Every structure is written in C-alpha cells, then in structure tokens.
C-alpha cells in the first residue's frame, strides 16, 4: 500500500529537478557479513532466490517508468549491501529494462559497489558487458589490523588485487577509505593515504569513522568498550591532511568526503547533491520524484522479504511525502553546500520565492567563511569545517 503524507506548499517548481539531473538507485540488501560500523540497510541471508529478486526489480522499474516517461537518464547506481554479490546476468537484465524505458545521456554513468572479497575477473567482465562503467570499491583501510577491527573480510593484499582486477575491466574505479579509526594518528593516516592515492587513478572517498546507534560499534561505545578513538583535534587534523594530500595528488575535494581528478566526479552522487530527481528501488531505498502535483520524497519498506512480496502482490509498500517549498529549499541548501562548487544564487532565489537576502550573510562572506563566485555561493575551506552553521545562516537569509 502506498501512503502519502501531505505538507503545506507555497509553490512548486516542477522543472527544478532538471538542474540536478535524473538517476536510478537500485538497492541490493544482502551482504556476506555485517560490518560493526555499518548502519545501512544490509542483511546476511543463508540463501537468496536470485530469480525472484531480479523480477521484483524489473517490476518496479516498469512501474516507475510510467511516472517518469520522457526523461533522459544520467545515471544508475547499484548500492547495498554488497551488489557485487549479484549475478552479472541479473545486472544485465536490470540495465536492459532501464535502457528500454529511458534514453541515456551522452555521459551516462552506471556504478556498482563492490567489496574486495566478492571480486573475480569473470564477474567483473560480466558487469562490464552488462553496461556497468564504473566501480566503487569498499577497501576502507590499507592496514590489515584495522581491517580486522572494522570487521572486514579481506586483507590489504586481497584489496589491492581486487583493485587491479577492476582496473582491467573498467576505466573508472573509485574506492572508499575510513579514517579516525581506533588508535590512528594523523601522520600514520598521511602515510596510508599517500599509498592509496598512488593506487587511485581518478576518484577516492574518505569518510571519518562515525559511531552510529544500532550498530555493533555503537553498542560497544555505549558500554565503554570501544577504546582508542581519536580526540576531536586529531580527527580534524586527519580531515585537513585528506584535503592537503588529495589536492597535491590532483584529486581535490569536490564534496565533503569525495575527491576526484577533474571530470571524474561521480555523476550519480551529483544528482543527489545538486538536488535532482532519482528513483529509489529496493528495500529501504529513498527517492525524490517530481510530478505535475509537486515534488515527493519516497521511502520503501526496510525488510527485504516484505518489500519483495509487496511488489509481487502489487501493494507497493512505500511512503510518498509531499515536499513543501520550505522542505525543498532546505534540502537544496543542505545537499548543495556539501559540494565545493556550492549552490546557484539564481536557483536559491527561485526556491525561496525571491526571499533570499544576501545582506544577511555578508559578514560570513567578508570573513571568508562563505565564498562567492560566478553566481555561486560555496563554503570555503574554513567554512567547510563550520558547514552546519553556514547552512543555518543561508537558510536564515531566506526567511
């Protein structure tokens, strides 16, 4: 059953999503094991009925195509979970159905997340043949002891081998690293990051370890058993080192945690950050869809089997929340200010119904906390460390 929550709206810009593009997110909820820091919707299953999952995805693609016909598709992202556990044949059929419904942009990007333990040359060749043209690999650390502490199932040697295999099949390969780990010091992070940058060709994501409630790490932290987490000062220094080393390697920050060579930024993630429309398919997937009636946030049921069964039964257990103009303005600023390029003043004026007052942030501009260039507002290097306050003041300037 589809549920709709209405919020008041003082005006809807039904074409605003075009400024950010259009993407499709496919959530594969299964993993070989649950990492202790992970708060994503991922599950360990003894067996998976691959055929029934494939057909559920195909049905949902058909349904959403009816709501978004005529759009040009910028990107597809297979996330999870561990999508590299999906058979290449499933990925092929999903992409075939997507291609049937939506024409692709000239620079169309299709990313699949992979863990080093689920990598083999034949599988990756199959993904490439299916139409995947970018891999995002969850390496997380180049230190074996830390991989064990993070609950990862691969070694550093296996990660490097998996990366090489991916490079043989794909022109674009990114990988994730986690810093501010237990007992980690800033200079040891610098050494590790330099090793990673020597491997990385065009894109790297570096995330600070966060302790989330509802995870194994969260439980240990609450019981005082998660020892050696860096002090805030050291964690901040590691963030600064990340900016320094990535920029020196020719991959500057284009988003808070993402670094890329020019022209190699993730197209799909920019659909999110530039506040475009995207379809979320799979258990727990979120989306943003604009219709003639307005813009909606969508969210599906978290439980894998409940989601799949609802698709087959035609119940479509998901929520559609109508986003008011204020909701859209807040989301636009929250997402866009994460990017180094920032947000368009013209679009800010449109979404705020002309209420943006530059004078209310002029002090922050003069203090070089907010930058201004070519009709864009962005957080400076100093402002990025104060991003929540920057966002607050920009939204306040739209009151």
Regions found by a protein language model. Give the residues of each.
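C-terminal scaffold of the Radical SAM
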Residues: 7-23, 42-66, 71-352
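Minor-groove-contacting beta-hairpin "wing" of winged helix-turn-helix DNA-binding domains
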Residues: 376-380
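N-proximal helix/coil linker or "cap" segments that precede and/or mark the start of modular domains
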Residues: 1-6
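A short, conserved structural fragment
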Residues: 365-375
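Short amphipathic alpha-helical interaction segments
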Residues: 352-366
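Short, well-ordered alpha-helical microsegments
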Residues: 120-121, 357, 387
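Short, amphipathic alpha-helical interaction segments positioned at domain boundaries
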Residues: 382-399
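Local cysteine-cluster metal-coordination motifs and their immediate loop/turn environment
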Residues: 27-42
């Amino acid at each position: 059953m589809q549920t709709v929550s209405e919020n008041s709206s003082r005006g809807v810009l039904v074409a605003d999503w075009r400024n950010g593009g259009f993407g499709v997110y496919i959530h594969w909820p299964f993993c070989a094991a649950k990492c202790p820091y992970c708060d994503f919707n991922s599950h360990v299953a003894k067996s998976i009925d691959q055929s029934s999952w494939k057909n559920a995805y195909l049905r949902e693609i058909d349904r959403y195509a009816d709501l978004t016909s005529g759009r040009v598709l910028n990107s597809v992202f297979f996330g999870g979970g561990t999508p590299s556990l999906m058979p290449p044949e499933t990925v092929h059929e999903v992409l075939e159905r997507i291609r049937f419904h939506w024409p692709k942009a000239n620079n169309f990007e299709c990313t699949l997340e992979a863990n080093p333990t689920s990598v083999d040359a034949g599988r990756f060749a199959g993904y490439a043949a299916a139409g995947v043209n970018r891999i995002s690999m969850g390496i997380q650390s180049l230190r074996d002891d830390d991989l064990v502490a993070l609950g990862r199932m691969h070694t550093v040697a296996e990660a490097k081998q998996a990366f090489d295999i991916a490079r043989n099949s794909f022109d674009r390969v990114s990988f994730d690293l986690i810093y501010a780990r237990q007992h980690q010091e800033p200079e040891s992070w610098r050494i590790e990051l330099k090793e990673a940058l020597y491997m990385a060709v065009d894109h790297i994501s570096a995330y600070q370890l966060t302790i989330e409630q509802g995870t194994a790490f969260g439980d240990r932290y609450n019981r005082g058993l998660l020892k050696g987490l860096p002090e805030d000062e050291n964690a901040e220094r590691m963030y600064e080192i990340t900016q320094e080393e990535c920029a020196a390697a020719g991959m500057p920050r284009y988003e808070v945690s993402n670094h890329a060579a020019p022209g190699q930024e993730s197209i799909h993630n920019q659909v999110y950050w530039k506040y475009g429309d995207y379809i979320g398919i799979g258990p727990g997937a979120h989306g943003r869809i604009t219709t003639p009636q307005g813009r909606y946030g969508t969210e599906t049921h978290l439980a894998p089997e409940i989601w799949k069964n609802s698709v087959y039964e035609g119940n479509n257990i998901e929520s559609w929340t109508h986003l008011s103009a204020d909701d859209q303005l807040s989301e636009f600023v929250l997402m866009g200010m994460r990017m180094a390029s920032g947000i368009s003043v013209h679009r800010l004026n449109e979404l705020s119904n002309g209420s943006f007052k530059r004078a209310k942030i002029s002090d922050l501009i003069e203090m070089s906390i907010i930058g201004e260039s070519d009709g864009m507002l962005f957080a400076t290097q100093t402002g990025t460390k104060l991003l929540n306050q920057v966002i607050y003041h920009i939204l306040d300037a739209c009151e």
